[in-house]
Amino acid sequence: ISRRKYMTTIGWTPYKYTPVEKEYELEFTHNAYFQPEKIAEIYKDTKSRFKLCPANTQFLKNFWMIRSPFDVELNVNRKEKTCRINQSQRFFNTFINMRWHEFEDTDLALCSFNFQYMFVADEPVWIEVYPAFLHGEPKNTRFINGTFDIYNWQRPVDFSFEMLDDTKPVIVKRGQPLFYVRFISKKLNDDFKLQEIEWTDELLKLNKRCQPQTWVEGLSWKLMKAGNRHRPKKLVK
């Protein structure tokens, strides 16, 4: 029995807001950030017959890759809780979140590079974030995975990771694969396409409504499943 294929459009945009500087938006990221890329492109020159395997094709078809927009070398002094990078203090304040208060002495150090993308959909679609398992994770990192419904919940994704050895630097280069995103819906055999959308005050307002974790622990997941009240019918436009 053949099943009809559906095509769902996912809107994406660089996340252009930072609370670090009042009334400052990261408009330059529009040109600095790379467009998400289909990860199946890694095999475009491969002649191996595994490419004919429908199980492999189905697995890869809804994955996209996110590349690093900047060169960063991060060095951490865990004892003194200080960092040193190859960029300016302004860059560090905006894009690097060394999450000192979110791990214990016995844990691996936790950090986020806030190279953020926001994905939205006009029907229920779940996003999953994965390490760059085909291209290779940035050295000395272990990626933090996640998933949520981008119809109900408007929040960005970023490169959050544990440092495997905080006595050694984490180095990423512009254009280096950082992580993957994958989209899943309830429709059988669904396909997706990505469409760049404009960053707007409306998106920012919706996103701020999806940040209860800043104030109350244990509430985000319950609210995500309930949905963002008063979200407009259409965000992908």
What are the roles of these predicted feature ranges?
Residues I1-P156, E162-K237:
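Non-catalytic terminal segments and appended small domains
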